[in-house]
């Protein structure tokens, strides 16, 4: 496996649904890069997923990654729930469709070439990188520029 990279992510939503954004910090050795984007109408879970997806999709070659998120939804979804969702044709145990399936499928694709250690950190607990991503996500949510077409298409 290639480079060892750290990725820190956070999503934010001003209302749920409402304007939202994601923030990402990528670190390789002494190099850091931040990414963020805001959406006019979305949900907090979609922004948490987008943060992880964008962080992973930014990498140009397979890497060994430690990805830190404050979202149990993302961490549990990708490490525990996704296997059964895929077996059931992207349905939950009660046969209902998986929420945010467009993003779960995109995340599933994004992880396929990497070796990832998924870490969870409590949000708003003073973790420097998580706090920085939270600031990026909130700023993006306050200045949205994009339409979350997946949210619009998958709305009940």
UniProtKB/Swiss-Prot annotation:
InterPro entries: RNase_H, RNaseH-like_sf, RNaseH_domain, RNaseH_sf, RNaseHI
NCBIfam families per UniProt: PRK00203.1
Quaternary structure, from the entry: Monomer.
Species for this entry: Photorhabdus luminescens
Compartments, record wording: Cytoplasm
UniProt binding sites for Mg(2+) 2: 10, 134
SUPFAM superfamilies: Ribonuclease H-like (SSF53098)
Entry protein name: Ribonuclease H
First-tier enzyme category under EC: hydrolase
The gene coding this protein: rnhA
Classification lineage: Bacteria, Pseudomonadati, Pseudomonadota, Gammaproteobacteria, Enterobacterales
Keyword Magnesium: yes
Annotated Mg(2+) 1 binding sites: 10, 48, 70
Cofactor binding annotation: Binds 1 Mg(2+) ion per subunit. May bind a second metal ion at a regulatory site, or after substrate binding.
Reactions performed catalytically: Endonucleolytic cleavage to 5'-phosphomonoester
Cofactor section: Mg(2+)
Residue ranges occupied by any RNase H type-1 domain in the UniProt entry: 1-142
Entry GO terms, CC: cytoplasm
Gene3D superfamilies per record: Ribonuclease H-like superfamily/Ribonuclease H (3.30.420.10)
Keywords: Cytoplasm, Endonuclease, Hydrolase, Magnesium, Metal-binding, Nuclease
Pfam family, one: RNase_H
Superkingdom in the source lineage: Bacteria
Similarity remark: Belongs to the RNase H family.
Gene Ontology biological process terms in this record: DNA replication, removal of RNA primer
GO molecular function: magnesium ion binding; nucleic acid binding; RNA-DNA hybrid ribonuclease activity
EC number: 3.1.26.4
């Amino acid at each position: 496996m290639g480079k060892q990279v750290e990725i820190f992510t956070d999503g934010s939503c001003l209302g749920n649904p409402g304007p939202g954004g994601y923030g990402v910090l990528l670190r390789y050795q002494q190099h850091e890069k931040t990414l963020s984007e805001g959406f006019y109408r979305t949900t907090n879970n979609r922004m948490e997923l987008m943060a992880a997806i964008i962080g992973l999709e930014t990498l140009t070659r397979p890497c060994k990654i430690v990805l830190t998120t404050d979202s149990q939804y993302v961490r549990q979804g990708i490490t525990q729930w996704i296997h059964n969702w895929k077996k059931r044709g992207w349905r939950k145990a009660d046969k209902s469709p998986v929420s945010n399936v467009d993003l779960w499928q995109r995340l599933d694709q994004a992880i396929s070439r990497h070796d990832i250690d998924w870490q969870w950190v409590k949000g708003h607990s003073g973790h420097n990188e998580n706090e920085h991503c939270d600031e990026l996500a909130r700023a993006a949510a306050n200045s949205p520029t994009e339409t979350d077409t997946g949210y619009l298409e998958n709305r009940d």
